Amino acid sequence: MSFELSASVVLWRGDEILVMKRAGGFSAGGWFIPGGHVEQGERPVESAARELFEEAGIAVEPEALTLIDVMSYETGRGTAHTIIYNGSCADATEAAINEEHIYHRWMTAEAYIARFLDEAMLRTRGASQSAIDLANEVARVIRAAATARSAPLSSV
């Protein structure tokens, strides 16, 4: 069994979040928020900012990211943990894609959940139970990010 640690950013542009379609490898064709593995000697928040820049060409300071939640899920090789942060960018910000992705879009959090994470839709498409469990976990943390974003800072 292995232990995997990654960090991801729910990046807000106004009321929309950035999602990116994977080109190949892990979950090819899936739509995800930017993120990736925490490198040796790197703090998770630094990884989140680095991955956002590498995957989308958008620079944010690690200090500008807010911790939201930790998502844990089984990978077949062990348990993976992804630390989720909220971030924001200017309304005119555009994302670029790297070789890991073939497309990106900005959409509301609820539209993302309904379009890509809906359990009934995934079951109809024959998704495995582990894929459905992961989608439910992603939907949970996206909702937590939306809730935290609208809450007063003193309650976050």
Annotate each language-model stretch with its function:
Residues 32, 66, 84:
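Conserved beta-strand segments that form the floor/walls of ligand-binding pockets within enzyme
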Residues 4, 12, 33, 78-82:
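Short connector loops at helix/strand junctions that flank enzyme active sites
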Residues 1-18:
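Conserved N-terminal beta-strand and adjoining loop/helix that marks the start
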Residues 28-30, 99-156:
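Nudix hydrolase/Nudix homology domain
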Residues 71-94, 105, 109-110, 134-145:
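Active-site-adjacent beta-strand/loop module that shapes the phosphate/pyrophosphate-binding cleft
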